From Swiss-Prot:
Organism in which the protein naturally occurs: Porphyromonas gingivalis (strain ATCC BAA-308 / W83)
Reactions that this protein is recorded to catalyse: alpha-D-glucosamine 6-phosphate + H2O = beta-D-fructose 6-phosphate + NH4(+)
Lineage: Bacteria, Pseudomonadati, Bacteroidota, Bacteroidia, Bacteroidales
Xref: PANTHER family: GLUCOSAMINE-6-PHOSPHATE ISOMERASE (PTHR11280:SF5)
Name of the protein: Glucosamine-6-phosphate deaminase
Gene Ontology terms describing biological process: carbohydrate metabolic process; glucosamine catabolic process; N-acetylglucosamine catabolic process; N-acetylneuraminate catabolic process
Gene assigned in the entry: nagB
Gene3D superfamilies assigned to the protein according to its UniProt record, in alphabetical order: 3.40.50.1360
Amino acid sequence: MRLIIEPDYDKLSKWAADYVIERIHKAAPTAEKPFVLGLPTGSSPIGMYRELVKACKEGCISFRHVITFNMDEYVGLAIEHPESYHSFMHRHLFDHIDILPQNIHILNGNAPDLTAECDAYERAIEAAGGIDLFIGGIGPDGHIAFNEPGSSLTSRTRIKTLTTDTVLANSRFFDNDTNQVPKRALTVGVGTIMDAREVMILVNGHTKARALREAVEGAVSQMWTITALQLHRQSIIVCDEAACVELKVGTYNYFKDIERNNL
């Protein structure tokens, strides 16, 4: 596991966007062999998306031969609702880049058969050749996508009931009214994420400090699903200084030292 520690959120976002651009360029995708990208929602990736939009508009990157799969979507929230993850992704990324509409994949939380929707999503990922780079964020309790504490570390795309902590955290997007927050979601599984050839997780702010500590220094546990990343063959956590406040001094200094030429 790599840990990239940046001074603040803006630099974290720039580093992450540059890494995405680098990986796409290195893959040199074509229509026959596209680059497959897994994408998150939430507040953490917004800065990265802003940098990617800027780079696309400046001609530094093209998404024409990129296929995307989003991590999750609420159950029962209309696609056109401003807080649906369909709306989020189009607002922050898809409407501003040259991606082909048919290459965008987001779970349908209003599908008549939610289990069939989840199974079809797994098949679509497999048909695309698997995910080259899966990007994610984490919650204060260390959940990745909507894989809440207690989720199996080999789980696949499925329906999940959201914890009270997650509902409370997400209520900030719903006028701080927990009654408006959907209580279920469709989410890729921990196993789905772990199947990606690379995983990059964005962690920012003091509220994620304990989760970062568990991710880097803790034991692998289903109670902190982010810890599964320790078992991935090629994983990166990109964080800011604020998220590092609970790391041991030795851990912090170690990663600052070995990554000093990559910051």
